Design a protein with these regions (language model features):
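Hydrophobic positions on the alpha-helical face of helix-turn-helix-like DNA-binding modules
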Residues: 1
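Acidic/histidine-rich catalytic cores and adjacent linkers
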Residues: 102, 120, 153-296
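Conserved beta-strand -> loop -> alpha-helix junction used to position metal-binding or nucleic-acid-contacting
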Residues: 103-110, 115-157
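Short, solvent-exposed loop/turn segments at secondary-structure junctions
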Residues: 53-54, 110-111, 135, 250, ...
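Hydrophobic/aromatic-lined pockets within catalytic cores
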Residues: 20, 24, 97, 117-121, ...
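RNase H-like nuclease fold core
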Residues: 4-106, 110, 114-118, 122, ...
C-alpha cells in the first residue's frame, strides 16, 4: 500500500495510527445501524458465540445474530473466561430488550453455556458440530492401529452430514452396534509396575473414552437443529474473518485487535450512507479521547 501511495511505510503507519489507537466500539455500530432484531419487533433469531485467538493470551470474543448474519458485539480478552463473557452478554441482553433468541450455538465451554442458559431461560442450546468434529478427529486418529478407533471414527465423521431425524436415528444405531462390539475397551485398565508411578491404574484407551462421551453424553445439544430449524448445526460467527488474518501478520497484538474491530464494524455498515454515519460517530469519540489524553 505504501508503494502504491508513493509514501514511506513509516508515514503510512503514522497516518493509520489514529485508527488503530481508537478502534470502533460496538455501541457506535448499534447507533449507526441498529441490528435487525431490534428494528423488527419479535423477530426470531439465533445467538452465536465464538472466539478468535490472535496468538497466546489474546482472543477476540464475537457475538452474532447468526440468523441474520449480523455481528452484535465484540471485545478482546486474555482468555474466553466467564468474567469476560458476562461483561459482554450483559449489554447485549439489555440492548435486545425482550427479544430473546430462540436458540444459541457455541463451542460448548461449560461455564459459558451455563451463563447463556441463565441469561435466556428456556432457550435451546446447540453445540457447534464443526467443533465437535474437530475434537473427534483429534481423539480418533485416522491411522490408528486399533480397529475400534477406526470404526468409531468412521461413524463419528458423519455427524456434520445428518439432515433428518431418520439420519440421527441411524447414527445412534451405528453407535449402539459399535458399543455392543467394543464396550470392553472402554472399561479396559492399565495397571503399572509397582513403584513406577503414584497412580494405581488408569483407563487404557482414554481418548476412545473421551470420544465416546462426546458422542453419547447430552445428545440433545448435538441435534437441536433437527427439531428447531432456525438453529444452525454449525457456528459461522467467524465466517470471512480468517481470510484477512494474513494482512495482520507482523503487527503488534493491539493493532491486530484494532484491525479486527474495524473489520467487524464495517461488516455491519456496508453502504456509503451507513459508513458515513459510523464515520461521524467515530470522529466525535476519537476527538474526545484525544482531548482527554492531552488534558491528562
Amino acid at each position: 500500500m505504501a508503494q502504491a501511495e508513493g509514501v514511506s511505510r513509516a508515514l503510512l503507519s503514522r497516518r493509520f495510527q489514529v485508527f488503530l489507537q481508537n478502534p470502533p466500539h460496538p455501541l457506535m455500530v448499534w447507533k449507526a445501524n441498529p441490528p435487525t432484531i431490534t428494528s423488527v419487533p419479535r423477530r426470531l433469531w439465533t445467538y452465536g458465540f465464538d472466539g478468535k485467538w490472535l496468538g497466546r493470551g489474546c482472543v477476540v470474543l464475537i457475538h452474532r445474530d447468526v440468523t441474520h448474519k449480523e455481528t452484535l458485539w465484540w471485545s478482546d480478552s486474555m482468555s474466553e473466561s466467564i468474567d469476560a463473557y458476562t461483561k459482554d452478554i450483559t449489554p447485549i441482553k439489555h440492548l435486545t430488550k425482550d427479544n430473546h433468541p430462540v436458540g444459541t450455538i457455541s463451542d460448548w465451554k461449560p461455564g459459558i453455556v451455563r451463563i447463556m442458559g441463565e441469561t435466556w431461560e428456556g432457550v435451546y442450546q446447540q453445540r457447534c458440530l464443526v467443533h465437535v468434529e474437530r475434537d473427534l478427529k483429534r481423539l480418533l486418529p485416522l491411522h490408528s492401529p486399533i480397529p475400534a478407533t477406526q470404526y468409531l471414527r468412521e461413524i463419528a465423521m458423519r455427524i456434520c452430514s445428518l439432515k433428518t431425524r431418520a439420519d440421527r436415528n441411524h447414527f445412534f444405531f451405528s453407535l449402539l452396534l459399535w458399543h455392543n462390539e467394543y464396550e470392553s475397551l472402554l472399561k479396559e485398565r492399565t495397571i503399572p509396575v509397582f513403584g513406577t508411578t503414584k497412580k494405581r491404574w488408569w483407563y487404557t484407551h482414554s481418548n476412545l473414552r473421551r470420544a465416546w462421551r462426546i458422542l453419547t453424553h447430552d445428545t440433545d445439544s448435538l441435534f437441536e437443529y433437527l427439531d428447531v430449524p432456525i438453529i444452525p448445526s454449525t457456528n459461522n460467527s467467524l465466517e470471512g474473518i480468517n481470510s484477512h488474518l494474513a494482512r495482520r501478520r507482523g503487527l503488534p497484538k493491539e493493532y491486530q485487535v484494532a484491525m479486527m474491530y474495524w473489520q467487524l464494524a464495517l461488516s455491519r455498515c456496508k453502504t456509503p450512507s451507513l459508513r458515513k454515519q459510523l464515520w461521524g460517530i467515530w470522529k466525535q469519540v476519537a476527538a474526545a479521547s484525544q482531548t482527554t489524553q492531552i488534558v491528562t
